[in-house]
Amino acid sequence: MAKAVTVKIRLVSTADTGYFYVTKKNSRTQTEKMVMKKYDPVARKHVEFKEAKIK
């Protein structure tokens, strides 16, 4: 069996609400930490989400 190319990551809200998304990324092509703007329903606005490890 070969090692999986995609890994699951957790996108944590920078608004410190504790809200997060779980998504996948290709660790070979995207070596830097992922940052994206998504909707945070707790803060009720779009904020940046930064990559963190899934525990």
From Swiss-Prot:
Any one biological process term the GO annotation gives: translation
Keywords: Ribonucleoprotein, Ribosomal protein
Record keyword Ligase present: no
Entry keyword Ribonucleoprotein: yes
Domain of life: Bacteria
One Pfam short name: Ribosomal_L33
InterPro entries found in the cross-reference section: Ribosomal_bL33, Ribosomal_bL33_CS, Ribosomal_bL33_sf, Ribosomal_zn-bd
Cellular compartments per GO CC: cytosolic large ribosomal subunit
A molecular function GO annotation: structural constituent of ribosome
Family matches, as Gene3D superfamilies: Ribosomal protein L33
PROSITE patterns per UniProt: RIBOSOMAL_L33
Similarity comment: family membership: Belongs to the bacterial ribosomal protein bL33 family.
Identification of the protein by name: Large ribosomal subunit protein bL33
Annotated source species: Methylorubrum extorquens (strain PA1)
Species classification: Bacteria, Pseudomonadati, Pseudomonadota, Alphaproteobacteria, Hyphomicrobiales
